[in-house]
């Protein structure tokens, strides 16, 4: 059974849904923007094809958002491999600001739920190959609180052949984000990319060390 048929099967009689098929490959950023534009829901949630939501993720997350009048939340998550084995854990801070995100970003896209009213034409996913979500989080951090829920509500799959695993592409896109979109000068951009690289290496080392305990 192909993925589309499987999705239709599990969603049948459960929720209202609409499947949008692009006529050509336009990239993940543009595809998400189209989905947001066609949505009429109050909230938008994301789930990449290889990630796993925990059973009560949306229920728990929306309860917290409504109770605390929040517009943007994300959660802690497990990192898993292609065999669903836990290879790391990521715990999130309660609040993130722009000054935090410009240094490093551990927000898992598939853990995010956001109010659709925040996502306007000027505030949508970028068109880079890997940092399209990071770019949007930077923009949104200037106008709303980013609230981290310290509960593991997602299993984020780490695969060697995914775009997010392409380190050189990551740093190239980070350079474009800082230089061309965040309008940083060349020296500041180089400094920010170097700092991002250091945080990335520290995180990778920490994850490798933590694997001993799983």
At which residue positions do the language-model features occur?
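The conserved acidic donor/metal-binding loop of glycosyltransferases
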Residues: 48-52, 76
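Glycine-rich, basic loop-to-helix element that forms the pyrophosphate-binding segment
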Residues: 22-39
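Acidic donor-binding segment of Leloir-type glycosyltransferases
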Residues: 1-21
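Conserved donor NDP-sugar-binding/catalytic core segment of glycosyltransferases
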Residues: 56-87
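Conserved nucleotide-sugar donor-binding catalytic segment
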Residues: 37, 89-169, 173, 177
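Non-catalytic, C-terminal membrane-associated alpha-helical segments of glycosyltransferases
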Residues: 161-214
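Conserved donor sugar-nucleotide recognition element shared by glycan-biosynthetic enzymes
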Residues: 3, 28, 32, 57
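Short aromatic/hydrophobic "clamp" motif used to bind/position activated sugar donors
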Residues: 44
């Amino acid at each position: 059974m192909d993925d589309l048929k499987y999705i239709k099967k599990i969603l049948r009689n459960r929720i209202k849904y609409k499947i949008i098929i692009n006529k050509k490959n336009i990239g993940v950023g543009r595809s998400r923007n189209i989905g947001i534009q066609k949505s009429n829901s109050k909230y938008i949630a994301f789930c990449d094809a290889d990630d796993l939501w925990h059973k009560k993720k949306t229920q728990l997350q929306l309860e917290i958002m409504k109770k605390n009048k929040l517009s943007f939340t994300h959660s802690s998550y497990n990192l898993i491999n292609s065999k669903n084995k836990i290879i790391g854990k990521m715990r999130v801070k309660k609040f993130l600001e722009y000054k935090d995100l410009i240094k490093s970003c551990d927000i898992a896209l598939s853990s995010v739920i956001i109010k659709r009213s925040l996502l306007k034409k000027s505030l949508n996913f970028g068109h880079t190959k890997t940092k399209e979500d990071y770019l949007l989080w930077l923009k949104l951090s200037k106008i709303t609180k980013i609230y981290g829920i310290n509960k593991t509500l997602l299993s984020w799959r780490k695969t060697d052949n995914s775009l997010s695993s392409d380190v050189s592409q990551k740093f190239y896109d980070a350079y474009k984000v800082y230089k061309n979109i965040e309008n940083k000068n060349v020296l500041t951009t180089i400094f920010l990319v170097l700092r991002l690289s250091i945080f990335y290496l520290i995180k990778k080392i920490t994850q490798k060390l933590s694997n001993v305990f799983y």
